[in-house]
Amino acid sequence: MFDSTLNPLWQRYILAVQEEVKPALGCTEPISLALAAAVAAAELEGPVERVEAWVSPNLMKNGLGVTVPGTGMVGLPIAAALGALGGNANAGLEVLKDATAQAIADAKALLAAGKVSVKIQEPCNEILFSRAKVWNGEKWACVTIVGGHTNIVHIETHDGVVFTQQACVAEGEQESPLTVLSRTTLAEILKFVNEVPFAAIRFILDSAKLNCALSQEGLSGKWGLHIGATLEKQCARGLLAKDLSSSIVIRTSAASDARMGGATLPAMSNSGSGNQGITATMPVVVVAEHFGADDERLARALMLSHLSAIYIHNQLPRLSALCAATTAAMGAAAGMAWLVDGRYETISMAISSMIGDVSGMICDGASNSCAMKVSTSASAAWKAVLMALDDTAVTGNEGIVAHDVEQSIANLCALASHSMQQTDRQIIEIMASKAR
């Protein structure tokens, strides 16, 4: 809970972070479907005998190639099956945290028996949509999630409607934290980070705890593309320098390796994405350790990173053709710049250089290769900080970068929200043709 003595704007900032920075076990798109299946199973009379599911094209894109924790299998069907048979309906993005070996075996058996289907919802005007319908004989229960990974909008069974989310806002109800955040600025966020009482933001240290554990697991070399472990080996061979820059990349990518490879450890997510949470966290942690920062400085830097990442991503569709590890890394750049220098000018220059560098990176679905994009984004963030410390940045004379960092962010988000929609359709078409 936040301190009620804080000014109302700061309270909304803290609520925004508490809503958007949460533990998540497994890639959040398959997990969203697993949650829908788990909630449906909880409403069903009797054991689940069959699962049908429908998802948006974007959710299908992010579910085709990612490993579901504990299963050793990729894809949405195993996520739906395990959610239905072993999911914790009350655990949100950690829906699979209590899945037992027996539940995993049962889910695989259900899949092998041809009792699980996942299709693209047609037509579908939602970017993030998942619906799971579970059956026991003629009895059924159906749950629909729209707009957010855990945002359940409808629950229905063979007996009738159980729940429907009301779309209207009650008179006098406060605006959502994200709505308030959309009207703020980076300068106001920095003022908050500098002045808010440490006790009010201490909770953000949990992001370091969770994501550092994931990073350590990734360094075992057992997960995904083991980029972090591979780069660490190359340091030992003398092919890569073991310095601050390489440590940022190694420890950040290792966490993503474990995350995407199916490790049964939660990530602290950001904006509904574990990789975004990792990218907003690990570079800041590594730099903080390098400078011997205490818990308070680390918490302030992490708060700046996570809140800046949320602020930028809030101007984007929830899922798009733009790899959002890049926008999370813009938050990391802000956090690292604050640790080293602390000036608004340095922070804004670092973000502008990031926009001039990695803004064109596409999202071609969640998979082990996400760790490559995470490592690239983390490296670019530190490079942008180093440039800013030398009073150098991509300027408003170049590309989509404007003279003002707020306009630069708006330009990037407009590109992702509008022009890249066709890119997204092309990516989904290519991936669907591979899956056939």
Swiss-Prot record:
Family to which this protein belongs: Belongs to the UPF0597 family.
Highest rank taxon of the organism: Bacteria
InterPro entries: Ser_deHydtase-like_asu, UPF0597
An individual GO BP term: L-cysteine catabolic process to pyruvate
Pfam families attached to this UniProt entry: SDH_alpha (PF03313)
Name this polypeptide is given: UPF0597 protein YhaM
Listed HAMAP family: UPF0597
Organism lineage string: Bacteria, Pseudomonadati, Pseudomonadota, Gammaproteobacteria, Enterobacterales
Record organism: Escherichia coli O9:H4 (strain HS)
PANTHER family in UniProt: UPF0597 PROTEIN YHAM (PTHR30501:SF2)
GO terms, molecular function: L-cysteine desulfhydrase activity
